Amino acid sequence: MPMTTIAPEQVNRIVWNQHHDPFEILGSHPIEQNGKNVWVVRAYLPNASAAWVVLPEQRQEYAMQTVHDPHFFECIIETSELSNYQLKTKEGEHERVSYDPYAFRSPRLTDFDLHLFAEGNHHRIYEKLGAHFTEVDGVTGVYFAVWAPNARNVSVLGDFNLWDGRKHQMRKGATGVWELFIPEIGVGEHYKYEIKNFAGHIYEKSDPFGFQQEPRPKTASIVSNLNSYNWSDENWLEQRRHTDPLTQPISVYEVHLGSWLHAASAEPAKLPNGETEPVVIASELNPGARFLTYRELASRLIPYVKELGYTHIELLPIAEHPFDGSWGYQVTGYYAPTSRFGTPEDFMYFVDQCHQNNIGVIVDWVPGHFPKDGHGLAFFDGTHLYEHADSRKGEHKEWGTLVFNYSRNEVRNFLVANALFWFDKYHIDGIRVDAVASMLYLDYCRKEGEWLPNQYGGRENLEAADFLRQVNHLLFSYFPGVLSIAEESTDWPMVSWPTYTGGLGFNLKWNMGWMHDMLDYFSMDPWFRQFHQNNVTFSMWYNHSENFMLALSHDEVVHGKSNIIGKMPGDKWQKLANVRCLFAYMFAHPGKKTMFMSMEFGQWSEWNVWADLEWPLLQFEPHQQLKKFFTELNKLYRSEPALYTLDFAREGFDWIDCSDNRHSVVSFIRREKDTENFVVVVCNFTPQPHSHYRIGVPEKGFYTELFNSDARQYGGSNMGNLGGKWTDDWSMHSRPYSLDLCLPPLGVLILKMDKEKTAKASGS
């Protein structure tokens, strides 16, 4: 038997993937032999029939011998120093020279990194965990690090080792982070982690911090460099940093990239360098089509949104997800933009182009739950690592998903850093946090006995609330001027109040009450609306309790609810008039705005995630006119500060009359911040026009009709006020003057006093 410096049981721990620190065995080690200081090099090389240690600087080779196992090699070299060695291996007829991963002993993660992560406060942990192309001791390669504290062994799998978990076993640190630098591989490598628990079960997992994944249904992570893109949005970011978004116009076009528009042909998309993108088929229901890439969407979607006049695009979740039918809300790759539409750099290009066209980007973010897919976060290291072990806290049975354990520091850090990551690396301008209520209440969609109370016996998830406060506090600290929007459907207090007041720290909250009230109201026969005037007026009773965003989202056009136009009563003309009336009132009402794709041209059918929108409708004049209506409405909204600068201040809104339920008419004033400018809004919610409808106004003069939702160019009957009206010296509604208006059927008027014309008429 050849001489060896290693015991059989130590070799077996390597061979059987049972060692938490293979660096103790493998690599180079100084030893004393026969009174001399020598070096021993050990390597476990499955599939190799022979191996040598190569010293390139000395141009020497040393044959290695096998010990205790046919593929465990050892070599003793009589030298006082040993560095920069390589291993030459023979596999079949092929020989290969490469650097030994176990020669790079110094960890990239510092003790301070690990300390911050363990206490949940490493805000840039994504720069440490995951896969990072780097250089160590003059050798390029990829550094891998993954948190799996309860695993017995973790290995890196990839094309570079033929997906053999024996070849690149990782080292476990004191905090449960496993790491390994693999030399001579680079960007574009596919990889996973092979995780073995103490029962011997093996799990193949995608990288929780992976920056890119394969297109579904494949699940490998891909090494990606996020620092190679050259951004051109410095001016946008600088302006954002010094702007209060709550005093700005915010009109959001909510879009699902996978169903907005498909490429008609499955031909691959061309990249700027002449290469082609991988083809990702959009749907089995539409086999001849493929998804547009991020770059193609930049050239199609951005001009479309810009033409319509929206200020922001909101993307349904673009983090990697395995199932198209989840719409992106069941995420497995929190740090990876979905590869359905291209690479991380392609998504950077999309955001950059949005900014260069003065369009902000909001991304839906899903920190409330995650799916059970085997390659994802579920049961990650053979234990309930990211989720609660008790299903009464750790599972949403209604959705078939798992709930994050917000009380665990590392899990909280994973999510907090993820929110920051999208702003840092992709320059996004806001997040909309999905299903906040499901996070805040322990009994959400759970029957009695299916949930556990908090330490005070209540149903509030205190850890989740603290987590949301931490996210929002850090977001606005690092990235002033961005948006954090809550989809919160209950009356949890102070959702959009700052954290220093005890609030959750969002700066906007979807107004779900307004949405339900208005959709119920507009679905009624107009004759019955007189009995439900409260649906229109109630929102102003609580409007100043939160910073509200009025949203008519994707949730309102699926699951048998019909699209917006299909909810409206009457014939086609009345349906379209109702749609115009609803959205004109929405844009005049205090609050920021969000509407889902397809509403702008009156799609009749529900949203179908498997197909693109019904673009052929734009061949027909009524749908062209509706699109024109939204273009002009956005233009007015953005140009008239009275409609947005005081959305969240009481002085920004005054009712003129909200009690005319007999005619189903409301009228009010919107005021501009720091000026005396205001607009007058009058809404007629029935098809009955009124040729002499009088309302009180605060100032004498000529009121220009800025907007009429019944204009002929929008498909209306063209009833109006011939461009404007002079006031009468006739007090009404506690105002000293009044206007005698013609109210169009199912119409909204927005008027503004023309001070120049008024001054000329008065001779001043």
UniProtKB/Swiss-Prot annotation:
Protein name as catalogued: 1,4-alpha-glucan branching enzyme GlgB
InterPro entries for this protein: A-amylase/branching_C, Branching_enzy, GlgB, GlgB_N, GlgB_N_E_set_prok, Glyco_hydro_13_cat_dom, Glyco_hydro_13_N, Glyco_hydro_b
UniProt cross-references to Pfam families, sorted A to Z: Alpha-amylase (PF00128), Alpha-amylase_C (PF02806), CBM_48 (PF02922), GlgB_N (PF22019)
GO cellular component: cytosol
Similarity annotation: Belongs to the glycosyl hydrolase 13 family. GlgB subfamily.
Keywords: Carbohydrate metabolism, Glycogen biosynthesis, Glycogen metabolism, Glycosyltransferase, Transferase
Biological-process GO terms, alphabetical: glycogen biosynthetic process
Gene name of the encoded protein: glgB
NCBIfam families cross-referenced by the UniProt entry: branching_enzym (TIGR01515), PRK05402.1 (NF003811), PRK12313.1 (NF008967)
Any one GO MF annotation of this record: cation binding
Catalysis: reaction(s): Transfers a segment of a (1->4)-alpha-D-glucan chain to a primary hydroxy group in a similar glucan chain
Entry's EC annotation: 2.4.1.18
SUPFAM superfamilies (UniProt xref): (Trans)glycosidases, E set domains, Glycosyl hydrolase domain
Active site, UniProt feature: 434 (nucleophile), 487 (proton donor)
Metabolic or biological pathway, per its Swiss-Prot or TrEMBL entry: Glycan biosynthesis; glycogen biosynthesis
Subunit text: Monomer.
Function text: Catalyzes the formation of the alpha-1,6-glucosidic linkages in glycogen by scission of a 1,4-alpha-linked oligosaccharide from growing alpha-1,4-glucan chains and the subsequent attachment of the oligosaccharide to the alpha-1,6 position.
